[in-house]
Amino acid sequence: MASSSAPVHPARYLSVFLVMLIGIYLLVFFTGDKHTAPKLGIDLQGGTRVTLTARTPDGSAPSREALAQAQQIISARVNGLGVSGSEVVVDGDNLVITVPGNDGSEARNLGQTARLYIRPVLNSMPAQPAAEEPQPAPSAEPQPPGQPAAPPPAQSGAPASPQPGAQPRPYPQDPAPSPNPTSPASPPPAPPAEAPATDPRKDLAERIAQEKKLRQSTNQYMQMVALQFQATRCESDDILAGNDDPKLPLVTCSTDHKTAYLLAPSIISGDQIQNATSGMDQRGIGYVVDLQFKGPAANIWADYTAAHIGTQTAFTLDSQVVSAPQIQEAIPGGRTQISGGDPPFTAATARQLANVLKYGSLPLSFEPSEAQTVSATLGLSSLRAGMIAGAIGLLLVLVYSLLYYRVLGLLTALSLVASGSMVFAILVLLGRYINYTLDLAGIAGLIIGIGTTADSFVVFFERIKDEIREGRSFRSAVPRGWARARKTIVSGNAVTFLAAAVLYFLAIGQVKGFAFTLGLTTILDLVVVFLVTWPLVYLASKSSLLAKPAYNGLGAVQQVARERRAMARTGRG
């Protein structure tokens, strides 16, 4: 037990808490999106639903194992800590993602395949606006019917160089069949009742295969043709996205649509990344993604950068160039950075990229649908009911404290206000930085946290009563009571926190949110009791006014102490 005669500096404790509270609210008002309210879960606010349709390079149906793995990875991306309130479910060959709020782009980005490769840059050229479809020029020599005027490069053994302003095709379109002039005329076949249905998967697989044939050719002349052509369609969606072969060269565009690149085969892939984090660059003027490679990749990167100083190296994500910096020096240690293009990374985009790289690439590529709004399953009425329940619980605690402890009950109220202020600010920051959303289960955890905080006050005040029963004054009973109570308070909160931790790690769904808020309020209860309640009660014990039983509610206890002393004197007499 700590000595009750040790010097106490309550102003220091209160100052520490005020500095913490001010610092947290500065973060709330001056960082991030500056939204000053906690994010609400799907059950209270509604959300956005996006369906991701799996696509495979060969057009086959995705396997159950691949879909389950993709579901697990996307769940980790959107709900890494289990407190975002998002849902990822398998629906046939699709994954359905539901996230709180109305940001459909965020939900679609979760389906990003996130296949990262580091490729040396062989050539590049500025992107050019796509020219309108050229009209066929008159020719002195007639073309055979049904034959295209200029064979496309992808199918020509010695393709002609593309003319300036012309827009070559990446692959030929099947010409319409024409009648053979040498064959006798025959009646046209009867038109079918219905056009044969095409398989979208097979059609997409053919388009991907033709893109690979054009943009991943090993022929140098074909590479230059593909580079010139790709420069005219950087603004278009990339059919190849996430399906390029890392062992072959690649012609692609940057994510800012300003440059087309010819890239060599990959030297390092994303599965060789050990960790990815986001933060400010060394100059403090922009955001970057820091990568840490695994052992073999770290050696490869160190050797490569040492041997290729002055050359350009591209970081491709899902077949597009995210960053293409010039190597200035050898980079040992297995670490490197990815900086954004134009526009540069924001805190949100850098964090999102680091998140998808950290949890790995998907085994499948997905095509997202349009975002759909999902209505709240419970709605604001449930939120209002939860808040009313919390207010009633708080009011009962305050009434009990005022009736039983008088002025000390006011100190309880101040401590609860301090705790609530800190909880609110932390919930705002958690929603901003780890995507925490407050649902009905989380509100239940907060309400139980009020009871935990009140329990700490009761333990402290009852220990003070015990000291007064033993004959001590209110002034001397407070430090001695605190020395005895704090161990009990820490032990009780430790048990509650342990229960919350077990729930958090073993449960799924909304139970995680309940356990998270319960654990959070338990930790903050200790902070408030040590930095606010104890110093305030100590200051109150120095007041001659509050030492009066009419104000501190300890008259009955002091009467018991007087009776004990009288009995002791009678026994000695």
Swiss-Prot record:
- Stretch list, region Disordered: 127-200
One Gene Ontology term, aspect cellular component: cytosol
Identify the main location.
membrane
Which keywords annotate this record? Answer: Cell membrane, Membrane, Protein transport, Translocation, Transmembrane, Transmembrane helix, Transport
Where in the cell is the protein located? Answer: Cell membrane
UniProt GO BP: intracellular protein transmembrane transport; protein targeting; protein transport; protein transport by the Sec complex
Q: Does this UniProt record's set of keywords contain Acetylation?
A: no
Please note every region of biased composition (Pro residues).
135-154, 161-194
Query: What Pfam families does the record tag this protein with?
Result: Sec_GG, SecD_SecF_C, SecDF_P1_head
Tell me which InterPro entries the record gives.
SecD (IPR005791), SecD/SecF_arch_bac (IPR022813), SecD/SecF_CS (IPR022646), SecD_SecF_C (IPR048634), SecD_SecF_C_bact (IPR055344), SecDF_P1_head (IPR054384)
Q: How does it sit in the membrane?
A: Multi-pass membrane protein
**Which Gene Ontology terms cover its molecular function?**
protein-transporting ATPase activity
Q: Which residues cross the membrane?
A: 13-33, 385-405, 410-430, 441-461, 489-509, 514-534
Which family does the record claim for this protein? Belongs to the SecD/SecF family. SecD subfamily.
HAMAP family found in the cross-reference section: SecD_B
Q: What is the stated purpose of this protein?
A: Part of the Sec protein translocase complex. Interacts with the SecYEG preprotein conducting channel. SecDF uses the proton motive force (PMF) to complete protein translocation after the ATP-dependent function of SecA.
Relate the assembly described in the record: Forms a complex with SecF. Part of the essential Sec protein translocation apparatus which comprises SecA, SecYEG and auxiliary proteins SecDF. Other proteins may also be involved.
Name used for this protein in its record = Protein translocase subunit SecD
Look up and give the organism this protein is from.
Answer: Mycobacterium tuberculosis (strain ATCC 25618 / H37Rv)
